[in-house]
């Protein structure tokens, strides 16, 4: 479905000569297939966010390619990219319009993309709220009236509303306690198995990655330094950074 081949993305240093160019993504190759779950793990500044923006078509690589069904993803109209690949961000509150109630927030993508008329979109929004284990009264509430965990569930429901082929979860469980983190991850796992979208977790938290992923990529200094497949045996580790991550891992979600 989505494939990256030898992707490089460099950010120039700007007008001042002493500011060197930064190679944020260096020769990355990976593939995402529907029905599978992936994780991209790395510390802050490792290039995860840049790679995420490349995979969604928000950025264009300097060299290499990122394709959706064999066609450059950036060549698709924005509406088609938006429908195929959804991004669920870390901060649910800032991702939701504070002026709009929850039901409308979930329905709007369906209306704006012409998936269905307003009445049907609102009906589907109510069903999606149930799918993410939210009570019916949340439909008419504003984002500020919800907890952080509830806001993230609404964002997941909104992402599901356009029936995407891939959802990228960018630090989606950050800020949740252990119990709510486990609940959120189990919810996504259940939805992914039912709806068969590709799920990519972008995280600094190896515990989340190991709990969710079939395939785990470790990113450091803009490059994928290790690719691990479940059950993530230490014998498949090739890079010292991955070994360090594994040694420090506190699952917390088992």
Report the location of each language-model feature:
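The feature captures the beta-strand-to-loop junction immediately N-terminal to the Walker
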Residues: 41-43
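Helix-to-loop junction immediately C-terminal to a conserved catalytic motif
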Residues: 56
């Amino acid at each position: 479905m989505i494939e990256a081949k030898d992707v490089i993305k460099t950010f120039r240093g700007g007008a001042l000569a002493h500011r060197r160019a930064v190679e944020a993504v260096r020769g990355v190759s990976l593939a995402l297939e529907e029905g599978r779950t992936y994780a991209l793990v790395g510390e802050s500044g490792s290039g995860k966010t840049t790679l995420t923006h490349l995979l969604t078509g928000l950025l264009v690589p300097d060299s290499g390619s990122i394709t959706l069904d064999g066609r450059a993803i950036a060549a698709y109209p924005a509406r088609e990219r938006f429908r195929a690949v959804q991004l669920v961000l870390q901060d649910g509150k800032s991702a939701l319009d504070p002026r709009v109630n929850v039901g409308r927030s979930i329905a709007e993508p369906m209306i704006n993309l012409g998936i269905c008329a307003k009445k049907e979109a609102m009906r589907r929004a109510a069903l999606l709220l149930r799918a993410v284990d939210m009570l019916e009264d949340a439909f008419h509430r504003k984002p500020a009236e919800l907890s952080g965990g509830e806001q993230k569930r609404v964002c997941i429901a909104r992402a599901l509303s356009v029936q995407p082929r891939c959802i990228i979860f960018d630090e989606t469980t950050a800020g949740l306690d252990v119990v709510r983190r486990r609940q959120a991850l189990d919810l996504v796992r259940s939805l992914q198995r039912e709806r068969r979208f590709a799920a990519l977790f972008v995280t600094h938290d190896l515990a989340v990655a190991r709990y969710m992923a079939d395939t785990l990529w470790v990113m450091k200094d803009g490059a994928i330094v290790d690719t691990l497949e479940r059950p993530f045996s230490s014998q498949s580790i090739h890079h010292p950074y991955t070994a360090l991550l594994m040694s420090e891992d506190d699952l917390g979600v088992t």
